[in-house]
Design a protein with these regions (language model features):
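N-terminal export signals
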Residues: 13-36
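Short, well-ordered beta-strand elements
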Residues: 45-54, 107-109, 129-132, 163-164, ...
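Gly/Pro-rich hinge or "lid" segments in bacterial periplasmic/extracellular proteins
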Residues: 85-90, 171, 176-233, 239-241
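Surface-exposed binding/hinge segments that line
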Residues: 111, 145-187
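N-terminal lobe/hinge region of extracytoplasmic solute-binding protein
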Residues: 51-103, 134, 197-199
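N-terminal secretory signal peptides
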Residues: 1-13
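C-terminal segment of N-terminal export signals and the immediately downstream linker at the start
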Residues: 8, 29-54
């Protein structure tokens, strides 16, 4: 809330950040209406400490393996998807600049954004999309949302920045399914996710599963919005009373589950 008052984020970015951290729209709205001043022009700077309600040794920076709120938060900090949903529930292209669908919703074509780089400086391309999305396919896939993609026949590379998705049956909801955090795009052939493997607004500075992670602003992020904070620390306080007391004492800035 203080970041909003001080102009580090605007209304849309504040609501988006709260949503990424698992805070409901109603709760986020109450923060906004209680703020003493509304920020018209966001400024950069500051940091946030966010406390989730659970964590453990299975905490992961690999989006496809994520199952918890804390995994969700870290995936949103470090990665982008093909499509994203805004706080007004409308769908917009993210790593996909645009997409089209045939008349019976069995074939989607995605035009990918150019000039995007991963955190290690390598260029994002169609190869990364195919590798990331193919990880969801098959009965032995590690994905917790592989059922969403049961009708996928194949992902096809048309050119370096165009991919086609072919389905065995109509699915008009596929764009919504692609907004799931497990469907974030990661660099092709990544095996070590401890330093992150995404194109997102924040780099991984430190990651200790079951303890905390620290994320710092990506200086080469392809967007000019969505990363006004210098750093985000993500941890968990499993006891609800301790979590609330930490918030009231100012030891943390945000939390899930009152």
């Amino acid at each position: 809330q203080q970041m909003y008052r001080d102009g580090h984020v605007n209304r849309r970015e504040f609501l988006a950040a709260m949503g990424a951290l698992g805070v409901t729209a109603a709760t986020a709205g109450s923060f906004l209406t209680s703020a003493s001043a509304l920020a018209s022009t966001p400024t950069r700077g500051g940091s946030v400490i966010f406390a989730s309600n659970l964590h453990g040794p299975d905490d992961t920076l690999d989006p496809i393996l994520g199952t918890s709120t804390i995994d969700y938060t870290r995936a949103n900090a470090g990665c982008n998807g093909l499509i994203q949903v805004w706080t007004d529930m409308s769908l917009h292209g993210e790593l996909a600049e645009e997409w089209s669908v045939n008349s019976n919703a069995t074939e989607y074509t995605f035009k990918l954004r150019k000039g995007v780089t991963f955190h290690d400086g390598s260029a994002f391309s169609a190869d990364d999309v195919l590798w990331s999305m193919n990880r969801h396919l098959g009965k032995d896939a590690p994905s917790s949302i592989k059922g969403f993609f049961a009708a996928v026949v194949e992902w096809t590379k048309i050119d370096s920045h165009t991919v086609k998705l072919s389905l065995s049956s109509p699915d008009a909801d596929m764009p919504i399914k692609l907004t799931q955090f497990q469907a974030k795009i990661v660099k092709k052939d990544t095996t070590d996710f401890s330093k992150g493997a995404g194109t997102g607004p924040y780099l991984v500075e430190a990651f200790q599963p079951g303890v905390k992670s620290v994320h710092v602003r990506n200086p080469n992020y392809w967007r000019d919005t969505g990363q006004h904070l210098d750093a985000i620390e993500i941890m968990a306080i499993t006891d609800p009373n301790a979590r609330l007391n930490a918030l009231l004492a100012g030891d943390i800035d945000m939390m899930t589950v009152l």
